[in-house]
Amino acid sequence: MIPMNKYQTELTEELMNTLPQEVQEQLLETLTTVEFVKRLISPNRPYARDLPRDEKGRIIVDITNPHIIEDADYFRQPALHFLKYGCYTFLKPNSNPNSEFRRHWDEEKRRCYEGYVRESDGEWVTGFNYWFMNYCPMMVNKLIEGRKKAIRTEAFPFFFEGIYWRFHYLWQAREGGKHAIELAKRGCAKSYSLAAIMSHNLILGESEESNRRVITVLTAYQKEYLKDDKDGTLSKFKPSINFSFANTPFPHLMLKNSPNEMSWQMGYKDEYGVEKGSLNQVLAVSAKDDSEKLR
């Protein structure tokens, strides 16, 4: 049989005999001819510790030849703390820049911008991925012991390597000044990933250098793929920002919050009516047959 790394299901003769002949042939053809699949199952698939690092100590991620990811919960500690205790920290609110509370949240914001690196092996997640995993609850299916059916409940995202690849792909495209495109099946958190990027850019901005007057535009051919009342992407975006407003000290004052117009803007007006704050915006536009709407 085909040699594989220890994380794959062993392809035994017994297992193969449970499959129809046609499926056996298709499976073997895929495992032996599709280069990406061959790299995923290879006994020589690298670990993070085997990869070269950049000047910041981060591994150089090759999404065409993915490495094996270990101990992914290392990057989900805020989410795991919230799931266990119902809060992100036991530190008491304190606006003093030198307080533990302020330092804690300044570090969290830095990770949401720059990503988070594990020094021991250089493994890292991008800032958007860190925000997605720790500050963007989503509806997940959970199996309960003793019950046959799963329950649908709100929780934080699990770590999936496909989503890890997605965010690294987007980061590499952005850093390289290029566009990005993804073709994907249903049910792989595309809308939740987009919603996370939108809420990140609205509340924090894109980066430490670009955190004011950032405009993020979500577009789709038909409006129903956007709207929050038809399971569109906005139905994932709105709970995300509301959760952040309720549970973090990140900015929460809004100049505009209009689901009907599909438009949101951070900021506030002072006593003189002057608009203050980041003024970051999120807009959703249905292009339909008129691409000029996106101008």
Where are these regions (language model features)?
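Phosphate/NTP-binding elements of NTP-utilizing enzymes
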Residues: 1-295
